[in-house]
């Protein structure tokens, strides 16, 4: 356990995501994009992408119900629900905690709706058995 702790110790408290020479020269060349190299900004953006992508797929109709992975949608719905609840417990409440709750509620809602779409599609595929009396 101490070996694992020692291995991960250099990453504790590190806010910088990309520290190689290519990334640093890129962010020096384009300083307006430097906020992407901070985990405080990049993590919420990645979290929102877990909500925005399914919402756009639902609205545009590009993801058909038969292509929805129920296990993935279930885990993301559960994660969104748990983190939404957790965000309401954080004290003190501020804009960051409210945005955390909103992001996770959106993730739970859109993936919950995808589960509904998939189960509705599966039920429509069941062929009723006719009575032969």
From Swiss-Prot:
It is a multi-pass membrane protein. GO terms for biological process: mitochondrial pyruvate transmembrane transport. Keywords: Membrane, Mitochondrion, Mitochondrion inner membrane, Transmembrane, Transmembrane helix, Transport. It is found in: Mitochondrion inner membrane. GO terms for molecular function: pyruvate transmembrane transporter activity. Belongs to the mitochondrial pyruvate carrier (MPC) (TC 2.A.105) family. This is Probable mitochondrial pyruvate carrier 2. It comes from Dictyostelium discoideum (Social amoeba).
